Amino acid sequence: IILCENVAIVHTSKEREDVEIIIVTSSKFRNKKARPVTKGFLKKYPEVEREYNRLKKINEEQTYYFQIIRNGSLRKYIFLENIYTTCVKSAYTPAAIESIKIARGQINFNERG
C-alpha cells in the first residue's frame, strides 16, 4: 500500500527490465521494507539527493524513508505510470520522467540506453 500524500520523491535507476523504482516517503506506514534515508543512500542516488535537500530545506524536522522496488520486470513500468497519475504532489527525478515516458509509449523502449 502506498499513500500518495506521503510519497515525496520518485526516482528510477537502471534500464529496461532491470529498472528499479526508488520511492521516498514521509512515513513508514506498516511497511517493513521502508528504511530511513541515510547519507550512503543519498550518495548512491545523486538525483534523489538534490530533491531530498530541497525537501529538507522546507521541513527540516521531517524524517523520510525509502523503498527500492526491484521485482516485477516490465510490470514496474505500469506501476510507475499508476504512481505518476495518482501521486500528483510528489517530486519526480528526470530519470523517473524518462521511465514514465517509456510506460506511456512516448519513447520507444529500445531508444533509451
Please provide the spans of the model-predicted regions.
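Phosphoinositide-dependent membrane-docking surfaces
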Residues: 1-43
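Terminal and domain-flanking low-complexity segments
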Residues: 39-113
